[in-house]
């Protein structure tokens, strides 16, 4: 059985600690992937987790989702996240069983599996999630008729129907064109701004962090450097970690 992260009773509002790591060590099999990692994620922050493949971004997500126990140190979640329905997760892609006649409504309502939501509340939840994902009025449409970008929006809606305090996205805009990518980020930015949702977004795309992020985490060489985007995206910090400088806002890296 995987040990759950420690639960804290302190901090729940915008700016208070939702996730705290103290000298955290994470393993993938026998290999130590991340070591001596410390950071604090405050409520209402928009984080971008950046780094090459194999540097520990997905391993960190697994720990945050309770799928991987720390090999050392401490990972503490606020008590409001102890109910896993308070955490929404958006994967890179999802392939429902093609035999099923899946409507957008049926697909999005899968996000309520395991959540304690009264039947009378579900229609309002669905309407809210579709509106925030830019899919209003499409609930009766077939999932299979959606474009790639619309399917990613449906994945976002499926996570949002839980009304999560923490939304985690694992490279959800990979393989999407620039305009679709930007539209999805605009959806997330509005959610962050209007609802105060804390967002963790894993990506290789430095330009997204430059434009949208309040905080970033840089993964490199078994370490994670975390802090405000204005500090970590300075050329000298990026040069030290990756030998690169950030693009200007709006320039795709």
PLM ranges: what are they?
Residues 203-204:
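H-loop/switch region of ABC-family ATPase nucleotide-binding domains
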């Amino acid at each position: 059985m995987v040990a759950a992260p420690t639960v804290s009773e302190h901090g729940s509002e915008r700016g208070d600690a939702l996730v705290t790591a103290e000298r955290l060590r994470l393993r993938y099999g026998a290999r130590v992937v991340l070591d001596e990692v410390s950071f604090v994620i405050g409520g209402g922050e928009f984080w971008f987790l950046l780094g090459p493949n194999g540097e520990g971004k997905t391993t960190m997500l697994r720990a945050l989702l309770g799928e991987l126990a720390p090999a050392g140190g401490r990972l503490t979640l606020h008590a409001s996240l102890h109910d896993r329905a308070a955490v929404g997760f958006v994967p890179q892609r999802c392939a429902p069983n093609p035999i099923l006649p899946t409507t957008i409504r049926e697909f999005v309502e899968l996000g309520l599996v395991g959540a304690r939501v009264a039947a009378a509340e579900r229609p309002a939840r669905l309407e809210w999630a579709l509106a925030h994902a830019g899919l209003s009025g499409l609930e009766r449409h077939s999932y299979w008729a959606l474009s790639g970008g619309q399917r990613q929006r449906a994945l976002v809606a499926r996570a949002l129907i839980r009304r999560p305090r923490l939304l985690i996205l694992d490279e959800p805009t990979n393989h999407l064109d620039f305009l679709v990518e930007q539209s999805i980020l605009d959806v997330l930015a509005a959610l962050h701004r209007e609802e105060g949702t804390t967002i963790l977004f894993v990506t290789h795309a430095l330009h997204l962090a430059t434009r949208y992020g309040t905080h970033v985490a840089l993964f490199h060489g078994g370490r994670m450097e975390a802090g405000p985007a204005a500090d970590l995206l300075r050329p000298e910090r990026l040069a030290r970690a990756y030998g690169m400088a950030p693009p200007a806002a709006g320039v795709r890296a």
